[in-house]
């Protein structure tokens, strides 16, 4: 049933592209690719027309065949629940449109003046664009000297308009053809009209005329809107930037050089946004005459053809809009505003943060089940996390002909609310004056260009009789609780009284002499363990610490501590033959530096070899030293292996402890992959850098295979790594993968798991659920981490669970969510990742099985270079039917695996070809 609901919601979110009428039952399915853009910018256009004239409003569509459109007019005299003007529908919902849609206005009257809205929707979402129609009763034969002024004010501002004339006492003011009357809020003094505390109803066209004539001296288009921030909000909010004056705007009509109207909104100069977001830069300004604006990028003129995906230059709104930004959009963006009296400029810095794309994530536990009383109110909350702009719908499951499901098993629903994330309170569904018919299941559906997610909750409606019964039951329950609580408190008080009485009868003994007794003890700092090994079975040295202990309760005195490290001839390397070089990195308890070791190669004593040296920091503690020694001793008992970092020698005498290990010249696997990403990837690590080598798909499989071999060897030595990740795998000059960082590793001999009991920083995004929640570490928990490492490999160094807070990750893992298939991965290899992420540890494969499977895949593929523009199914030797994959072609973050035996969901394109949706519109 869960799979059916997911299939149904996928169709619903794509706006009924393949829908079926409930009444007629006739299908009209058509699989159409839709553009991310819906309406062409710049349409419809503002118009000014005389009474009795005609005008055509034009809306241009990008994909008319898959788009539905409707025309509205804003009624500024009526406000909706969110405080915005009510939209009055002028046409029904239009379908099967041409590329250009025209709404004609004929025989225009003064009542036709106002704002007209073109609203379109398709599977990509919704878009609205509007235009003002200004209606003039009559104009004088002589043209007015001043042009029409367009002003935008915020709620609560003061509007002051001046009409330039020699006869100020003979001026009358009209709004949309109706004379403006003087009242407590509107003051008309001679040729000046002042409106205090403006509201939405004050929006419109104002005209000043000479009394007794029909000569329009001047007209003003006024728009009142909410305060508009200068963040990177969506472009489809129908908001306008302030292009007019502030509270006192008398001086706007005199000659003046450009100036900023809202400098406080331009204080934020650095924008750091995730890739895929929409960015809007604003430079609200004015002047007289009205200035023009142009945009520069890094000091050069910036036009739409300079950027893939184009730009939107909304000059009348003083804004630059860029959709779906990528790292190549980074740079300095400057607006230059100028007229004949001067020019001003302002610069923004844009930094696009690298993110792997993902579908929306819904906060766990929301929406919640709700109970309401008949006639009361209720609300559902749905918290959405999404880098790309999401579209949200609220659905109610309904019954048709006595059934909640159609003949094909898909449930019936109706849409009760829809909108984008930046619309007012779209994440909240309000239900008022509830009746019994409102009871049922409600779903929150959120989707973006990558995919969709949904969660449901139930509304229970109680009658007054049900409420009375509930109250009686609660009162009875509370009575029982009070009785039991009173009895418990009485028992506790009795025990306390008895204890106090006994203390009075038997007074406490005199305390012992608390003089500190000093003694000297010598004890092992850490118990050493041995593992049977042909090469290093003699390594069982004890580390001793000498310290002064006090028997008093005061802290241990700061005395000299002496550590005794025994000399090991098999591993000791002369300190004078070692030349330290530049640092390579820092760990949790020490640092690693590059060094040259003379004679460390026993086969060639005269050879100078490059090594990596692990050592402690200056502020290291006893525990840090013990951890480094533990790692050293663990590496001693390991045989040489090609896919692990091997120990070469140690320096324990006459100086600080040095641990000499193999040097890997190409650094960590994570940075190795990132540095070799193709330049065409939207989230390339460095867009200016040409990859040193072009990786093949076989190279990626080889990386996973080599790491699996190294982990198979560690598992055979009963060693649990606990921090397996791409950052802890090093790459040599010959592209050999070597597992490193045994700082968190623990040897196991008689038990097969290690349970962590101390608190510390742990790699939570790589940890298995049993390690994360129960602190139990096994070889199977390392297998889980290996699955995450495979995901890193096939995303070329991507970050797991991008943009998900750690607290939210805990909930998602408990609910069974798993990461989706990377776009550069075959179905077969993704299934191996999913096996590694099995909720039951014993059901995960062993490293030996993983080595065998990856070896088989490696043998069956050829050296083909990566092409990230196409899916990787072509490289799969065994996955013939890709349509049944558990993930879409897009690279999203999560898929849900509530049950291990849950069947795979159909892909999106298969859904459209096989299923129909039954919906009704409220």
Swiss-Prot record:
Residues 502-922 are cytoplasmic. It catalyses: L-tyrosyl-[protein] + ATP = O-phospho-L-tyrosyl-[protein] + ADP + H(+). This is Fibroblast growth factor receptor 4. The keyword Cell membrane applies. Keywords: ATP-binding, Cell membrane, Disulfide bond, Endoplasmic reticulum, Endosome, Glycoprotein, Immunoglobulin domain, Kinase, Membrane, Nucleotide-binding, Phosphoprotein, Receptor, Repeat, Signal, Transferase, Transmembrane, Transmembrane helix, Tyrosine-protein kinase, Ubl conjugation. Its EC number is 2.7.10.1. InterPro entries: Ig-like_dom (IPR007110), Ig-like_dom_sf (IPR036179), Ig-like_fold (IPR013783), Ig_I-set (IPR013098), Ig_sub (IPR003599), Ig_sub2 (IPR003598), Immunoglobulin_dom (IPR013151), Kinase-like_dom_sf (IPR011009). It holds the Pfam family ig. SMART domains: IG, IGc2, TyrKc. One of its GO terms (cellular component) is endoplasmic reticulum. Ubiquitinated. Subject to proteasomal degradation when not fully glycosylated. Autophosphorylated. Binding of FGF family members together with heparan sulfate proteoglycan or heparin promotes receptor dimerization and autophosphorylation on tyrosine residues. Autophosphorylation occurs in trans between the two FGFR molecules present in the dimer. The modification Phosphotyrosine is found at residues 753-754, 865. Belongs to the protein kinase superfamily. Tyr protein kinase family. Fibroblast growth factor receptor subfamily. Tyrosine-protein kinase that acts as a cell-surface receptor for fibroblast growth factors and plays a role in the regulation of cell proliferation, differentiation and migration, and in regulation of lipid metabolism, bile acid biosynthesis, glucose uptake, vitamin D metabolism and phosphate homeostasis. Required for normal down-regulation of the expression of CYP7A1, the rate-limiting enzyme in bile acid synthesis, in response to FGF19. Phosphorylates PLCG1 and FRS2. Ligand binding leads to the activation of several signaling cascades. The active site is at 723 (proton acceptor). Its main location: membrane. It is a single-pass type I membrane protein. Glycans are attached at residues 46, 96, 107, 219, 332, 369, 401, 422, 433. GO terms for biological process: fibroblast growth factor receptor signaling pathway; positive regulation of cell population proliferation; positive regulation of ERK1 and ERK2 cascade; regulation of bile acid biosynthetic process; regulation of hematopoietic stem cell differentiation. Residues 20-480 are extracellular.
